[in-house]
Amino acid sequence: MYIFIKGEVLFGEKYMKKIITLSFCFMFIVLFEQSEAQSTDDVTFDVIGVQLYNEFIPCVGGPDFNQENVDKMMKGWRALNISDDLLGAWGYVPATDTSRFDNGWWELSWESKEAADAAWAQWVQDEEAMAFLAENESVMVCNGEERASWDFTFHRDVYSFGPMSEDGSFFTEFFPCKYNAGKSSDDLMKSIALYNKWLDGLDATSFYAYGIYAGDGTDELADFWWGNFHENSDGAAAGQASWLETGGEARASLEATATCGVPEVYNSGVIYDPSVPEFSKS
């Protein structure tokens, strides 16, 4: 999001562990991209307004952490008994040395909390999976017990500004946001409508998509996170400049609705996508 930034908002205390920075970079394929034969209209229908249950898991790189070992581990992980209810999984790597967090993240996407909880219950009882994770602790460890969950929704066609770059790379900004006094998700939806109208007027062809990670009201530091997905960091900078210059009514509405902290920025990529052979179960 091209949004007004005021102050600084942090994640919850349990996510402030100082752990080794992940440095891998996976290829990114949008979660709902089904195949080259599927039309953009199909993708749009599948994505817009669909509420998903997404989880973020903090991960630590070990002494044997390198690209070759990570690739091997990911291939092995996709060969395990992964739940059919898992819609997708992504890796996030801090893009700057000034990130609040030294750790990387896995994001898992599900249709519901019930589906996620059922899959986790089966996963921790899977002896083959537990043995695999133990064997790869020197490469990477992800702490499932520390996962955080959010209701995620796309509010615009992810391809409205064109396709991803050919190599699949993209750049992510996560803005932690707190509703201003008297404001709520209803006000945010009105602001989003104005934001989409503003986006419609842009003369831009660089890939850009965004989504909202809504909290359950129990986090004192962030009511929701706004996720920006750009083609690259240059695209993010250009978008921010355009927003500050021409945001107008949409910008005023968003700033009146919520105050958002300095974003966390990441190089990101797919770990699992059941619709893409290279990243599906093997």
Predicted regions and their residues:
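Short, Lys/Arg-enriched N-terminal segments with co-localized hydrophobic residues
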Residues: M1-Y15
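Composition-driven detection of intrinsically disordered, low-complexity segments
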Residues: F11-E13, L22-S23, L254
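Universal eukaryotic N-terminal targeting presequences
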Residues: Y15-K17, S282
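Sec-dependent N-terminal signal peptides
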Residues: I19-I29
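Short S/T/G/P-rich N-terminal loop/turn motif that feeds into the first structured element of a domain
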Residues: E36-A134, S138-S282
